[in-house]
């Protein structure tokens, strides 16, 4: 039997009810919560991220919520570092880390580790930005396609941050992101074969979602409508009023925020903004489902069931995560 300390992953698509179940679990288990969400890290972005209320967070604290200003970037590597530190602190107090959220790349980074990418090089980054100003980002995307077609296929020409980083990695290291990630994948496979652990925990993997996809779509539509009624547009106006924030930042590119930003720019009508915001959220949920379908040892719960807490506890007891 493994002597590794326990941890619980509670995953699922957006609007599935992850937070509610996580709160119920913390009421009956010695758990402490860690958020796994690339948008919830930002302060001042509350309505559009469906961030738990201040009252709820005061009663049930979540690590890694409201830790950054929207002007700052936060990578999967940053998350892995912060999450491992939080998990170690929680475990040291005899508690169980309960990680809850839907940013699947973060879970993957935590489980498998990350490719050893070169550190940012301000000089190279400045050179890339100068080229972009002179030639346009499409020309730089063409450069990336020539050296790393796999990354170019994933990165849109209008995503300057990721495009710049992919070119920077190649210019600094002489290897493409795809090559470095392939090397990391091989190392992870070899580590698993030799019994080495990327993550020093015995992890129970839970996922919650409605079995009826149409129900999820209706939830997404209703939640986006509720956000607008709660003042989502005013929240984005406050962000736009800051001179250091712009549409190219990761925070502003978050689902919902980019559509409201475009509306305020006059690029979309109110109806178009609502429609595109809902569609973008559905597309996010679809991507989350794609990740989850490939996840190993995953125990599914139906959002519509009224007995998910006992079902989750039964599963955790079955795999001896609580012993």
Swiss-Prot record:
GO aspect biological process, one term: tRNA modification
SUPFAM superfamilies: P-loop containing nucleoside triphosphate hydrolases
Domain of life the protein comes from: Bacteria
Site (Interaction with substrate tRNA): 103, 125
Residue ranges of the region described as Interaction with substrate tRNA: 37-40, 161-165
Entry EC number(s): 2.5.1.75
Binding positions for substrate per the UniProt entry: 14-19
Sorted UniProt keywords: ATP-binding, Magnesium, Nucleotide-binding, Transferase, tRNA processing
GO molecular function: ATP binding; tRNA dimethylallyltransferase activity
Keyword Lyase carried by entry: no
Catalytic activity: adenosine(37) in tRNA + dimethylallyl diphosphate = N(6)-dimethylallyladenosine(37) in tRNA + diphosphate
Positions contributing to ATP binding: 12-19
Cofactors that this protein relies on: Mg(2+)
General function of this protein: Catalyzes the transfer of a dimethylallyl group onto the adenine at position 37 in tRNAs that read codons beginning with uridine, leading to the formation of N6-(dimethylallyl)adenosine (i(6)A).
Subunit-level organization: Monomer.
Family recorded in the similarity comment: Belongs to the IPP transferase family.
Name this polypeptide is given: tRNA dimethylallyltransferase
Species: Pseudomonas fluorescens (strain Pf0-1)
